[in-house]
Every structure is written in structure tokens, then in C-alpha cells.
Amino acid sequence: DFRASLDKMGFQFNEGRIIDASFVVAPRQRNTREENKAIKEGRGSELWNDKPHKKSHKDVDARWTEKRGEKFYGYKMHAKADQRHKMVLKYDTTSANVHDSKGYEPLLDESDEGKELYLDAGYESQEPIVERHRMKPVICEKGHRNHPLTDEQKKKNREKSKTRCLVEHVFGFMEQSMCGLIFRRVGI
């Protein structure tokens, strides 16, 4: 297997871990209001049974979401990468409307024990889950209304971000070198 080959060549994935998520755009669906209602209620598999060709082109798993005023339709890829090599060690795909902090736990396993886990501010409330997996959470802090970050917190965030941003290189590579993060399949 690929991972065993890398181990034989001396690649060691013993550094910390970095987790983040990125949108994967899917083709927009042209459904009627009734069809959309059925999909949202979880009855998407019951639709178009009399038209198998049409059903094979319909995606009932993709969802709409909005981030910073921009709307996305599709999925979200959650990835865990090695801190040193930027190698994706594990990934999972959810619909786009799932919050980053809800889709990362399946990526954690026993091989991560004792390692640092770098996360952005969106995972702020996830420290107990990370600690339950015997990892050391390194999470950027987030300011809140009427409670902005102090200069000391900003300085700590900059230090954490120097490592955490490496996972952005992984998504950037996929987007630039691998024809983007576009889902070319129907359904998860």
C-alpha cells in the first residue's frame, strides 16, 4: 500500500497534525420546489424512480451554505495532514452545510495520540474532544462581540497560524494543480 511504501522510504509522519475543511463545489441542481422539499426531508432516494436516467444525474446529498456572504453548493472536504510533510493522512466528505467543527472527529485515530493538533478558531469549543483522543489542542483564539482579542492573544495566534496555515497549502495544491476542488460525481 502507498503508506507502507512511504514508510520504507523513510518518510516519518510523527510530527503534529493539522485539520481544516474546504468547500468542494458540485453542479447546481435544477429541482422543483416539491423535489427540493423532499430532498431536505431526507426522501431524495424516492424521487425519479420512474426515470432512472434522470435519477442518476441528480445529487440529493449536496447542500447550500454561505460563508462571508458567498454562497456555495456542494460538499465540504475535511482533511488531516501531517505538520512536517503536508501529506494528507485522512479525509472525510460531508455536505457543505456541516460546520467544520462537526466533521473532523472521524479523522482522529489512535495514531494521533500524544501529538499536537492545530485547528483554526472555528474549532474553539472542541478542546475536550481533542483531549479525549489524547492529543494536545493548539487552537487559534477568536474575538467576540465587545471582547476583542488582546495583543498577547493576537501574538499567540500568529505563532499558531504559522504552523496551521500549512494545511492551506494542501488545499491550494489540490485547487491549483489538480483542477480544483470540484466534485465530479453524483452523491457522497
What are these regions (language model features)?
Residues E116, A121-I188:
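Helix-centered, glycine/charged polyanion-binding patches within enzymatic domains
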Residues D1-H133:
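Polybasic low-complexity intrinsically disordered regions
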